[in-house]
A protein has these predicted regions:
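Phosphate-backbone binding interfaces of nucleic-acid-interacting proteins
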Residues: 1-189
Length: 191
């Protein structure tokens, strides 16, 4: 991304910033709640047995009330880092070890305005067909980079995504291929 930004700047497109969408989010993966039960020493904590694709089941304690067996959720295991800078360590809660944390959308750095109301509180529950053990950045589309480009009046050819794609292909020495933008009519006449 930095190389592309530098090359675009050299040809007259001022790249103001390069933004990594999942910056600071490291080691968080998708996991499945295989078992859940109340903590014996607390009325607000839950013991979750988690399969996050590592080949072993780990115990994670949570105070969230919206987690159920078979839910697929973001799991920050020991060694993970959240966008806040927090690094996950093994913790002891009311006498039991917790080897990670189940994450809310806010803890993943997702703006609440982008979420449905039911996704704003508690643990971020993912669709049931979400594969386990996958980097959460990939699942949520946060494994991408955004170039913020300030266009000048002399670069009217780049005021749309096609123009920017042509310019990017030119500076990278690759072929530009126009995307297929055909529309297929359905029986009712709506596309």
């Amino acid at each position: 991304p930095e190389e592309l930004a530098e090359k675009l700047t050299r040809v007259g497109l001022e790249v103001e910033s390069v933004n990594y969408l999942g910056a600071g989010l490291e080691g968080v993966v998708t996991g499945k709640v295989t078992q859940i039960e109340r903590h014996p020493n607390s009325d607000h904590l839950w013991i979750c047995m988690m399969d996050y694709g590592s080949g072993e089941i780990v115990q994670i304690l949570t105070g969230a009330q919206n987690v159920h067996q078979d839910d697929i959720v973001p799991v920050a295991v020991v060694g993970s880092q959240l966008p806040s800078g927090m690094k996950l360590k093994k913790a002891k809660m009311r006498g039991l070890d917790s080897f990670g944390m189940l994450c809310s959308a806010e803890e993943l750095g997702i703006d609440a305005k982008l979420l449905l109301p039911e996704q704003r509180n508690g643990i971020f529950i993912l669709p049931p067909d979400t594969p386990i053990g996958v980097d959460i950045k990939k699942v949520l589309g946060l494994d991408d980079v955004v170039l913020d480009i300030d266009l000048t009046a002399n670069r009217g050819d780049c005021t749309n995504i096609i123009g920017l794609a042509r310019e990017a292909a030119a500076v990278l020495g690759t072929e530009f291929r126009m995307p297929d933008m055909s529309v297929q009519e359905t029986a009712g006449g709506n596309a």
